[in-house]
Structure formats: structure tokens, C-alpha cells
Amino acid sequence: DHAVWTRMYIIESLNDSNATGPAAARLLQNQVDIGNAIKPVYGDAAGTQLTALLREHILIAVDIIDAVKARNATAQAAAEARWTRNADQIATFLASANPNWPKATLQNLLYTHLSTTKAELVARYTRNYTADVAAWDAVYNHILVMADALSDGILKQHPEKFPGPAVYSQSQVDLQAGMRKLWTDHTVWTRLYIIESLNNSSAAAPAAARLLQNQA
């Protein structure tokens, strides 16, 4: 949801679309959902704090997008510096909650999230839609890596909270993860093609090609 709705917001904002507001609201709700997801493990205060940090992450991203649209390099650089500081704050907070989340590892994960998202924004803004497709794949593949690292850390720290009789082989786990990714790709690229096609956008053809690749 985080990566998908960030992409939707980028597209709608760069198009100055009436859908920008609803996309922003849904993206901000995702930060509440992420905070709520950790409350059963780390408590209400921790969940609320994570939501606040992630909300700032999104609002800074909005500032970066606005600066790119305005071609204001000074404002963009300042916002990107704030984005990095916010990533450091998120890493510090998470590392303090779980020893299986080393701060340096989290920083690397978050910095890659920022860089791949920026590449997506730049490709979209410059209307390099082939690069835009590749950038989105990089964003999405990395967000899965980050999500796995976070969930693995929780499972290692609190195995008692997640009891389960079934023990799956690595091949079974890989199959399940692969199928989820493929069907998520299918849904996301169908939606993106619908948006591009209805807007008569030059991005429709690259989106269609990526959607057809998913079927292969």
C-alpha cells in the first residue's frame, strides 16, 4: 500500500488531477495502518510515534514533488535533506524497539527507498515512461525487501506472539511470496493502465507492455 499509493499520488499530482486529494488521503491512511500494525507488539505509544514519523516522511515527499513541479532546485534540495533526516529518525526509533533491526541496516533500507522513489518521480516528471516502468519495479521490489526485514525482525524478537503449527519449506515460502508478487503486479499494472488510458497519456503503452509482461 505504501509504495502503491505513493506512486498514485505522484501520478495524480504531476497531472494536477482532481484525484490528487483522495490519493493523498489514502496514502496518509496507510501510515496510520502501519502504526496500528505494530501496536499489538510494541504498544499504542510506539505505534502512534511510528505513524507520526511516517506521516512526516509522506509530507516531505509532497514538498519534494511540489518543488520538482515548480522547478525550484533550492527547495527540492532542502526537502530532500529533511527526507534523509526523517529516515534517520525512523531508523533510530525502530532500532531502539528491536535488536534485530540494526540502525545501519535500516538506514540503508530507507535510503534505498528514498532513492528509488526519487528516481520514479524524476522519470515520471521528465515523461520517460519506459524508465518510469523500470523505476516502479525497483521501488516495489525494494519495498518487499524492507517489509520482509521488518517482519522477520518481529518474528525473531517475539516468536511467542506468532505461534503456528505449520512449518513451511523454503520452496513453499518462495512460491507463496512469488505468487503474491505476481498477482499484486497484475492488479497494480491494471490500475495504472486504466489511469493512463483514460488520461490519453503517452504512458499508456509502456503500462500496457508491463501489464502484458506480467501475464507471461
What is the predicted function of each stretch?
Residues 1-13, 17-20, 24-27, 31, ...:
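C-terminal amphipathic alpha-helix
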Residues 28-65, 216:
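Mid-chain, structured segments of secreted extracytoplasmic proteins
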